[in-house]
Swiss-Prot record:
Domain of life: Viruses
Single GO biological process annotation from the record: symbiont-mediated suppression of host cytoplasmic pattern recognition receptor signaling pathway via inhibition of TBK1 activity
Assigned keywords, A-Z: Host-virus interaction, Inhibition of host innate immune response by virus, Inhibition of host NF-kappa-B by virus, Inhibition of host TBK1 by virus, Inhibition of host TLR pathway by virus, Viral immunoevasion
Function, in words: Inhibits cGAS-STING-mediated type I IFN expression and NF-kB activation by inhibiting TBK1 and IKBKB/IKKB. Inhibits host TBK1 phosphorylation.
Matches recorded under InterPro entries: ASFV_DP96R
Taxonomic lineage of the native organism: Viruses, Varidnaviria, Bamfordvirae, Nucleocytoviricota, Pokkesviricetes
Species, as recorded: African swine fever virus (isolate Tick/South Africa/Pretoriuskop Pr4/1996)
Protein family: Belongs to the asfivirus DP96R family.
Protein name: TBK1 inhibitor DP96R
Keyword presence, Cell division: no
Length: 95
């Protein structure tokens, strides 16, 4: 007898099945106002360009580059110190 209760809502997602992943993304609840939004990664962008665009937005105090102004928190400022090294390394080795 299994003690695991798999309700239909909490079915594990098969990460190899694209349509299941899309269902999870498309059916996700709306984020509350002011929640961090991650910019779209355009097809022609490399990962490095996308990360750089994301960081530009954070450094300007925005959730999304050029949109949704938000005051930078101390956590953002502390994280940026660590994140910049990772960003520089990823830009050097990426596509």
């Amino acid at each position: 007898m299994s003690t695991h209760n798999n309700s239909p809502k909490e079915k594990p997602v098969d990460m190899n099945n694209i349509s299941e992943k899309l269902d999870v993304v498309n059916n996700a609840p709306e984020k509350p106002a002011g929640a961090n939004h991650i910019p779209e990664k355009l097809a022609e962008m490399t990962s490095s360009e996308w990360i750089a665009e994301y960081w530009k937005g954070i450094n300007r105090g925005n959730d999304v580059p050029c949109c949704c102004p938000r005051k930078m928190t101390s956590a953002d400022k502390k994280f940026s110190v660590f994140g910049k090294g990772y960003l520089m390394r990823s830009m050097q080795k990426d596509d």
